[in-house]
Amino acid sequence: MLLPESLSFTAWAGALQDFGPALQNTATIALASTAISLAMAVAWLETQFKSRHEALIYLPLLIPQISFLFGMNTLLLQLGAQGSIGAVIWAHVLFVFPYMMIALTGPWRALDPRFGQAAASLGAGRLRQLCAVKLPMLLTPICAAVAIGVAVSVAQYLPTLFLGAGRIGTLTTEAVTLASSSDRRITGVVTSLQAVLPFAAYLLAFIIPKLAHRNRSALQGAAG
């Protein structure tokens, strides 16, 4: 038979109890690294326009992780910061930030500058232009970038293992550890939990712009 003889939530209940801290670490690291990366991306796009140094942002995606994670690990060891959740967040930012830049650069620079100029003519400063004009108009790509950032962070294994010194457990590190386990039920539960956070992020990225733009017909098309 392809179907199990009986259905039970025992494995789920046990896994949620055993891997609750890993789930919490995964969510904390993903949200923190994504928030930091979003702030960095917005700051970069607001102050730089096709800078020649921008290519350096994407280096972590082009070179093997192990080639520079070892050096980062040595540096943090000397600073006494190895094995902390802050170190893991920093490592994740190195990979989340480039992906968020990829997602945001096109829409951000394609936005008609006349919107900002119109706001400036009404006395709005740079910060008010950003908060009242650009961010609402770019809510859809921002939400998409955040969802991508969360997914990228959740998937990180080597940065978590190296910079966390094996002391910061996430669902990804636990899933890899359980890959050779004989208990497929627990492995299935952990990998399912691993997919929950990215799925929730993408679902919110779809829903939030729809709700925010429900009374703005011109922006509803952009949200779709």
Question: Each PLM stretch: what is its role?
Answer:
Residues 1, 13-109, 137, 141, ...:
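Membrane-water interface segments at the C-terminal ends of transmembrane alpha-helices
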Residues 1-9, 163-172:
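Peri-membrane helix termini and adjoining interfacial loops of integral membrane proteins
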Residues 5-8, 107-117, 126, 139, ...:
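Transmembrane helix boundary and interhelical loop/hinge segments in multi-pass membrane proteins
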Residues 117-119, 184-189:
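Loop-to-transmembrane helix entry/capping segments in MFS-fold secondary transporters
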Residues 120, 177:
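Alpha-helical residues within the helix-turn-helix
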Residues 122-124, 136:
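Glycine/proline-centered hinge or cleavage motifs at structural transition points of membrane proteins
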